[in-house]
Amino acid sequence: MSTPTGQPIGLGLPDAPLPVLAPRRKTRQLMVGNVGVGSDYPVSVQSMTTTKTHDVNATLQQIAQLTASGCDIVRVACPKTVDAEALPAIAKKSPIPVIADIHFQPKYIFSAIDAGCAAVRVNPGNIKEFDGRVKEVAKAAGDAGIPIRIGVNAGSLDKRIMEKYGKATPEALVESALWEAGLFEDCGFGDIAISVKHNDPVIMVEAYRQLAAQSDYPLHLGVTEAGPAFQGTIKSSVAFGSLLSQGIGDTIRVSLSADPVEEIKVGDQILQSLNLRKRGLEIVSCPSCGRAQVDVYSLAEEVTAALDGMSIPLRVAVMGCVVNGPGEARDADLGVASGNGKGQIFVRGEVIKTVPESQIVETLIEEAVRLAEAEGLEIEEGAGPQVKITR
């Protein structure tokens, strides 16, 4: 807002710099296979298979799908002997590092290490007599050169901790994790990552804040039992956004009661939204209102489906009227403002052509490819429009 002379109108508020993320918290560095975890490396995205681990083909197929979706590290359950027996084949054939998830039976920790898994996650709250086995675990992991994640969950805290605190408070989660880490350190083993998960994002965030202040271990962020896709996405986004913006967090796993590929999509978008991961194709669209002269929802879905396979850093805007067109979407690389059966196609805020509504999606595809080529961006073979749109 300005005066008739062009001078800005002051509102009595001090000028404030644009908000920036806090620097990454300095941690020790770990290698999970070929993926670095710690403050010297980008924040990685993990998921967990939902197959029966002993079904090697099904598990490897799902790992391949996760890899194609951008998963950096994958975790597999190991509840039974048949699952432990499948680990060598899975670890050998997986295109990304495999972490074995161990509960209840300590013998499976050694099976996972012998199988060539890139790391092991242990839950000290439910592994039988775990404290007494730490020395053996530390030696085996140290000899194999792999890290251990101490994964503390609110639902399975050690009995001693529950007796002290009465419930899974942030302090209880942190004390449990650091106690176990201390046992490993006493054995000369320090390649440790920690997670302190709770299904309440507020408690989870506070637990990680306390843990970050008291240690230099790399932290695996997660909201346990987050729920169905929508609810879990909200919980994880709120919690991860809060922590990552403070520089806390080195690897993340979005837990959803959904296809694990969706976990990767959400995790990737969280990191992209915080500029912690190189942006890919981003579709922005207006929420629609009474001015809209086109079905914005359907058009946005069609554009998203058509461009989904293009792994290029372009922001494409879909606007329902000329009011929200090039002006409000001026930061977009490419976009459309629709009205009266037509679409104004704009590139970086400038209208370049007007096309019939039936040609909007096709034109956006053409312009996206042109922009990518002009920027010297490589479009992966097979990328680009994945569906054919007809109106």
Swiss-Prot record:
Cofactor note as given: Binds 1 [4Fe-4S] cluster.
Enzyme class: oxidoreductase
EC id: 1.17.7.3
Annotated binding of [4Fe-4S] cluster, by residue: 286, 289, 321, 328
Pfam families: GcpE (PF04551)
Catalytic activity from the UniProt record: (2E)-4-hydroxy-3-methylbut-2-enyl diphosphate + oxidized [flavodoxin] + H2O + 2 H(+) = 2-C-methyl-D-erythritol 2,4-cyclic diphosphate + reduced [flavodoxin]
GO biological-process terms attached to the record: isopentenyl diphosphate biosynthetic process, methylerythritol 4-phosphate pathway; terpenoid biosynthetic process
Entry similarity comment: Belongs to the IspG family.
Protein name per the record: 4-hydroxy-3-methylbut-2-en-1-yl diphosphate synthase (flavodoxin)
